[in-house]
Amino acid sequence: TANTVRGCIVAPPGKKLVIADLANIEGRGLAHLAGEVWKIQAFRDYDAGTWADLYKLAYARSFNTTPEAVTKGQRQIGKVMELGLGYEGGVAAFLTFAAVYQMDLDELAEAVWSTASEDALAAAQGMLEWVKKKRRSTFGLSDRVYVACEVLKAAWRKAHPMTCALWENVSTSVLLAIANPGETFRVRQLAIRVDG
């Protein structure tokens, strides 16, 4: 993926190509754009060496545990949550990232079902029933795995109210910009405009 693309990029003569991997740059940018204050502070604390990384924190917040108790495998679940759900991804996005990171979805489902609240499981089961009623795809997942992914999605969104509001506001502003060419619509630090 990234390494494959890097091999296609060559610096021009006299220039140097520098490769860098910025720690959770997607999450940092999104937290800043959305004004997700608790998360911005968590990044600051992580950078200062006084708090856990955000992948551990994502898992801990969803499974009602402490970041210190999060194992390497559990951190991977947190990573998938952060990367797959941050830009309005749902179960399908979670599934895609889980495949990339070779997660065992049955193990994931077991972890979720053994720790999630009855209310969270019931809400996710309700969403699954709605998806089936509307004849939408369940992506070949078992009901148990689908519900687990839905629980994680809902938990992530509950923990990120400013990010969810940003999605809604950007969507509305894009539609307004399309309907009103030449007019600029602002959402926090973003300016959305269609010309022509």
Feature names for model-found ranges:
Residues 1-196:
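Conserved catalytic core of nucleotide polymerization and phosphodiester-bond processing enzymes
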